[in-house]
Amino acid sequence: MIPLSIRVPASTANVGPGFDSVGIALSLYLHVVVKEKSDKWQVIHSFEDSIPTDDKNLIVSTACKVCPSLSPHIIEVTSNIPLTRGLGSSASAIVAGIELANQLGKLNLTIDQKVQIATNFEGHPDNVAASILGGTVIGALDGKNVSVVRIESKELGVISLIPNEELNTDESRSVLPDVFPFHEAVKASAISNVLVAALCQKKWEVVGEMMERDHFHEPYRLELVPLLPSIRKCAKEFGAYGTALSGAGPSIFILTPYEKRQEIAEQLARVFTSMKVCELEIDHRGITVNKKEHIGL
């Protein structure tokens, strides 16, 4: 068969008040290389032992749900996306599985279909839509209907502060309230609206202000990520636009002027020595498929 490789970017979700809606693709990647057919699915990887190497692997199980008639293959998976750190590792695996089914099953899925399927699996469009489309996305899931808008944000730099500790998404969601008072919802929604408008109009200072005024989730998750306020304060002093939890955490996501990202990252690394400080870029390509040769990490 023609060698096939799939590359899926990481993502950050929410960007503060854009809860389960706003996502940004990042320059960390999951790679899947499809090898020969086999009598059963085999996943070659060097991750921790808890990650399955058979058809229970999230990439393979997703692919088989999308196209149950797929012939088993041996696939090799590599990734520099940290697991359970709020950088879309599970979303990237779901997106990779959909593309694996699309390629091997010759499904000819459209971009919109991929986003719809991925959102149905994930439950919200922010991470998966960003990984599929690249750039910054704003999405909404209403019942089974998904609407997504993509915008460019090439003037922005990204820094991620990644702790050593993991934080399971289910655990992080468990601290959120079941009921949100109407007046709080109005306030939180207005802030989110201004965030999206500022992203579209490239008013980065306003973006930074809004992403630090979330009411939907960050106030409830602070107990799980206690360093967020001090990181936010330092990042602002160093010249960043704004700081927020990356997805459900525990990683911290910072938007900066593109030309200042390295300087700000170096300053933060000197202060927060217990965390891994990554200077990243926004990925503008989204998922890519290479049928000729695989370029590894």
Curated annotation (Swiss-Prot):
Sorted alphabetically, the keyword list is: Amino-acid biosynthesis, ATP-binding, Cytoplasm, Kinase, Nucleotide-binding, Threonine biosynthesis, Transferase
Q: What does this protein do?
A: Catalyzes the ATP-dependent phosphorylation of L-homoserine to L-homoserine phosphate.
The record's listing under Gene3D superfamilies reads: 3.30.230.10, GHMP kinase, C-terminal domain
This entry carries the following GO cellular component terms, namely: cytoplasm
Q: Look up keyword Nucleotide-binding and say if it applies.
A: yes
- EC top class, as a word: transferase
Q: Record-annotated residues binding ATP?
A: P82, L83, T84, R85, G86, L87, G88, S89, S90, A91, S92
Pathway membership of this protein?
Amino-acid biosynthesis; L-threonine biosynthesis; L-threonine from L-aspartate: step 4/5
Protein name according to UniProt = Homoserine kinase
The Gene Ontology terms for molecular function here are: ATP binding; homoserine kinase activity
UniProt gene name: thrB
Q: Where does it primarily localize?
A: cytoplasm
Where it sits in the cell: the answer is: Cytoplasm
